[in-house]
From Swiss-Prot:
Protein name: UPF0587 protein C2D10.03c
Family the UniProt entry places it in: Belongs to the UPF0587 family.
Pfam families assigned: CXXC_Zn-b_euk
Disruption phenotype: No obvious growth defects. No increased sensitivity to oxidative stress caused by exposure to hydrogen peroxide (in vitro).
Amino acid sequence: MGKFALNLNAELTGVKNLAPKDEESFYYAFKVQCSGCREIHDNAIEISRSETHSIPGSKGEANLIWTCKNCRKTCSFVIEGPFSPYNDSQETKKVLVLECRGCELVEFIPQGEWIANGAESNTLFDEIVLEDDWYDYDENASSEVSITNLEWSISKA
């Protein structure tokens, strides 16, 4: 069993509280490495806290049960706690913790829609895509806002 932290470091200009748009139904995408055969799989897995599955041979549940296509080892993933909104521009911060059994997280793939608030105006920006740098204009604060230099990392929690 291993607990992994998803960490974020980004430059926020004029925005705060960066988080998934709808955390309950949001799908986090990761590349994984099987702890049995050590294969890093090409296809990403997607995990949502809204899904629960029974763990085979156990009384427990997980957000995702996945089987390695090479060695057939069964792996389980549990999202622990809520996403912690990112506010600390240019500071690495743990934003999510996952418990993984049978495999390890090796890369986060940002996808889906994210939200943030204007730092001065509290304007809601609710269609942020983080596949690249993001820029917009906060009309209430009369200033440009942006999220740039995103660096996602995974560490032991």
